[in-house]
Swiss-Prot record:
This is Arylamine N-acetyltransferase, liver isozyme. It comes from Gallus gallus. One of its GO terms (molecular function) is arylamine N-acetyltransferase activity. Its EC number is 2.3.1.5. The lineage of its organism: Eukaryota, Metazoa, Chordata, Craniata, Vertebrata. The active site is at residues 68, 107, 122.
Length: 287
């Protein structure tokens, strides 16, 4: 594994001699704009190994993406190599249908400490408009505006909660809007976490379980999403979506199209720079 090869993969050629916030922000943004959040392996007959060398080979050498445990694991390795004070944390994602956080940890995120201040860095929550674009200062109750919207942490009795203020979608004629629950109000809860450091091996069982559990969104939907300079692309099953943030003062532009199987393959190559070794079986089960 080679840090320069990783820099090339994310198209980063800036200075990295200082493990500071400016460099962290640059690496993070290059990472999320080059490495898709995707679960395509489980929909084309591949096994996902939570092993650093396997993750490196998949994402850096084969130019694939990965789900949270892969893309954040790679980012953890890179930042560690660069000299950052960093640790892995475990998160419990919010399930809107159940109006509750999951009982078990099902997400990986990273905590970076710079000059005594802690920042949360998460490159693996990219299946929609909830991917942060900047490292988030670990402070409770403070709005942290970013291009995708306003994020904030709320801390309660040692548990931290990440939420985002929703923005309106401007949907041109002929497009189909993303589904959401209007009764949930203006705030979208994302996940909870504690500051207890984790080891990557703590997620081996989860990594294996998510590949076979029948009722998870990862089984029900083939997902590939990538942040762009002004929004994101998302391919869910046969539905391709493109969002541009702040298209209007109070709304983001959302355009969606339905693709054929052949167009799915072409879109993966053209929009996400992904060429799969095995045949993808697109999936998009509602609910």
């Amino acid at each position: 594994m080679n840090i320069q090869e990783y820099f090339s993969r994310i198209s980063f050629d800036g200075s990295h001699k200082d493990a500071d916030l400016q460099t962290l922000t640059a690496i993070f943004q290059h990472h999320i704009q080059a490495i898709p959040f995707e679960n395509l392996s489980m929909h084309c007959g591949e096994t996902i190994d939570l092993d650093l060398q396997a993750t490196y080979n998949k994402i850096v050498k084969k130019k694939r993406g990965g789900w949270c445990m892969e893309t954040n694991y790679l980012l953890f390795w890179a930042l560690k190599e660069m000299g950052y004070d960093i640790c892995v944390l475990g998160g419990n994602s919010y399930e809107p249908a159940k109006k509750a956080y999951t009982d078990e940890i099902n997400h990986i995120l990273l905590k970076v400490v710079i000059k005594g201040s802690s920042y949360i860095v998460d490159a693996g929550f990219g299946g929609g408009p909830y991917q942060t674009w900047l490292p988030m200062l670990l402070i409770s109750g403070k709005d942290q505006p970013q291009i995708p919207g306003i994020f904030r942490f709320i801390e309660d009795n040692g548990i931290w909660y990440l939420e985002k203020v929703k923005r309106k979608h401007y949907v041109p004629e002929g497009s189909v809007p993303l589904t959401d629950n209007p009764e949930m109000g203006n705030i979208r809860k994302l996940y909870s976490f504690t500051l207890e450091p984790k080891h990557i091996d703590d997620f081996q069982e989860l990594n294996a379980y998510l590949q076979v559990a029948p009722d998870t969104i990862l089984q029900k939907k083939s997902i590939c999403s990538l942040q762009t300079t002004d929004g994101f692309y998302a391919l869910v099953g046969w539905t391709f979506s493109e969002m541009k943030y702040k298209y209007k003062e109070d709304a983001d532009l959302l355009q969606t199209t339905t693709l054929t199987d052949e167009e799915v393959e072409k879109t993966l190559k053209d929009k996400f720079n992904i060429v799969l070794e095995n045949k993808l079986i697109p999936v998009n089960v509602r609910g």
